[in-house]
Amino acid sequence: MTLSIGCSSKDGGGSAVNAEALHDSISEIVADYPGEIGVALIVNGTDTVTVNDANIYPMMSVFKLHQALAVCKAFDNNGLSLDTVITMNRNDLDPKTWSPMMREHSEPEISLPVKDLLRYTLIHSDNNASNVMFKTLVSADDTDRFIATLLPRESFKIAYTEEDMSADHDRAYANSTSPLAAAMLVDRLFTDSLVSNEKQHFVMTALSECKTGTDRIAAPLLGNDGVTIAHKTGSGYINDSGELVAHNDVAYVNLPNGVAYSLAVFVKDFKGDERQAAEAIARISSTVYSQLSRHIE
């Protein structure tokens, strides 16, 4: 297991992070579980803690965040609004995949604005909505090229759509990221200018309404006054060895004491079930929250 740690502060003042203590606490949690768990934490845009970041992890539906940003950038470049309507033939959609959109729209031809497709992917992790946007708006290759302008080229790869991965589950490993790259992307989303203000705010708001994976990073945060979370999950298949290929969550959290942090947790090749994988993520989230919220008045 490769462990890494880093801590810096741009303003030269005191840090909100006891990086060594966090690193040790997270490493102890990771060691409790039968799988590879990678973690990256960025606090206030400066302090960084990573565990098992040297390896890459299947993103699964986390890549729908990358897709959303690529769609928004393409629409910015072409002067298009997210109100632009896309029409889909129901027969072209996959009835077997996860798709709240397909359940909620029974008409033979489904016409929806792009912003609704994005909401389906970001809030509900809808696979059909994602496939439609890859086919008609921005391809997986073009998404990969755009994200490479935001993140180090070697830190991630997007090669396949949800449809591609459904046809061959091994392809999930080709859509990969380091935990730090995922944490960097969500951190930049909330602190930098990546696309037009209106579209960027739209993506941020959608992530704050995410309905999936509330038993992961969000679990220890829900119900705490003044705490906000925006996140995107990814969930994988069971492979031929009976392992859970991936169980992920990437989040941006604001605390009432002024601390803001991005946290990425990726679980790979897990010899347990989804409940145990979610528990590992929630425990890591709880440890981070406990330390960073310590000085809330």
PLM segments and residue spans:
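Bacterial signal peptide processing site
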Residues: 8-11
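Short, conserved catalytic-motif segment at the N-terminal edge
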Residues: 32-57
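Mid-domain, small-residue-enriched loop/turn segments at the edges of structured enzyme/sensor domains
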Residues: 36, 110, 131-194
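Active-site SXXK
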Residues: 58-88, 121, 263
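Short, well-structured active-site flanking segments
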Residues: 73-93, 140-144, 196-200
